[in-house]
Amino acid sequence: MINKFLTIFLIFSIVIIKVLSQSSNEQPLNVVPYPQEVTMIGCNIPLSVGSISIKSNIESTILSISISRYQSLFFPFVSNNVLKDSSSNIELSLIIASDDETLELGIDESYFLLVNQDTYQIKANTIYGAMRGLETFKQMVVYDVVENSYSLTCAEVVDYPTYQWRGLLVDNARHFLPKNMVLHIIDSMGYNKFNTMHWHLIDTVAFPVESKTYPKLTEALLGPGAIITHDDILEVVAYAKTYGIRVIPEFDVPGHSASWGVGYPELLSNCPGYPQSSIPLDCSNPYTYSFLENFFSEIAPLFQDSYFHTGGDELVIDCWANDTSIQKWMKTNNYNTSDAFQYFEDQLDVILKSINRTKIAWNDVLQHGVKFDKETTLVQTWTNINDLRDVLAAGYKTITSFFFYLDRQSPTGNHYHYEWQDTWEDFYASDPRLNITSNAENILGGEATMFGEQVSTVNWDARVWPRAIGISERLWSATEINNITLALPRIGQFSCDMSRRGISSGPLFPDFCSLPDDLSFSFKPVYQLSKDEIKLILKKK
């Protein structure tokens, strides 16, 4: 009995020591997001360029692409000082329980990773768990800039995400992002173990999505050629899947709808005196719903995921009260504007059910008195923590965004930072379930949002990274992994690693980030001065 008690006590003590060491005292493994459990083994294995091979026990097209990708990322600097002998060649073994490539919310992303002098192994239940393990393994391959050499850190890792929904909103409407830029964004998301891309495809200013059913929708373009074709969507969805990233489309209705009306003005309400940007879809017109049904039926099959975001935020609802035909319709049905909004959302539910999709809507729809089916609707909360509590109290499942607005210079309520880059600390400290005492289990996760009023291809990376690295860790790692001082050097190093992979992620503190030649020397002046020209120019003051 005493021996049994001592055994239990020792196991309990070891667990406590492990948790405390990771949360309070040290984070010895230089990995982002930080894993759930880490045991350092105390060795570093020297490597030479090209010395890592990967072997899997299953066949999977998606996994093969992921393996090829990481094979190309292990050694960004092609020359090093490590001898190319057989002793530094290692074979990483992937042992995966299932070859099922189905990707959906709640997919198992856990993995076990072991690196020591004799074993190089990742075990996972799914190919997507193996992918997460490959990213961790990649970060354990360390480049020493002084010695110009590589080594592999020995450790045992048990890892899984804290939140099942770890998203990033990509705005393709306010500034057009061409397909290759979207693929580049997916690369950066995959490196950070994000698993959901919320694709905000249209807005008031533009409708850049091709429709073969309603071709005049793309009369509302930002510029010539600024259009996302069906083939583009299919490629984006497929490419994202090779990172274990689900793609959720958002078509925001009934507000933010001016772009719908450029090609099809009969869809819009008639509200004299209201700016065009404030005019919503006509909730009283049966044509509105047949149009949406036909359009959504065309678009939904391009996306594999069961979730479909219908927006609903920032509706200028008084417009409906000032449209004479809508007034007449509301009077006939004994509706007020809240009833009209409820009717609109109910019709959306019928449409989404017919195409086998689950609704996501912004939380301010609820603030108009609208009620959703709690079993078939996911609410995205973007306003504040009190509204989050209201959403939870009403029994809805939710994902949170108000913590993670990347388009703002500082998160809401925090104005003490002098450097906007330092707002990563606010994001890092913002656990979605923090200060939530009721129904916290209904918070599925969170989304960083990069609305694009002032963001385009030229500055997207710099506005998102490295700040979103902190968000990725907050959504993946254990709640106890929250020490900003310990996180800073890891995130700084990983930001450099992302730069070496072609993502323009900047520094968080003064440091030196060596880049491969193809990245370091990619900047060239429009006119290259010769040595003689330099001397001639400097000859006179």
UniProtKB/Swiss-Prot annotation:
Keywords: Glycoprotein, Glycosidase, Hydrolase, Lysosome, Signal. Glycans are attached at N322, N336, N356, N435, N483. Its main location: other. It is found in: Lysosome. One of its GO terms (biological process) is carbohydrate metabolic process. The keyword Hydrolase applies. The keyword Cell cycle does not apply. One of its GO terms (molecular function) is beta-N-acetylhexosaminidase activity. Belongs to the glycosyl hydrolase 20 family. This is Beta-hexosaminidase subunit A2. The gene is hexa2.
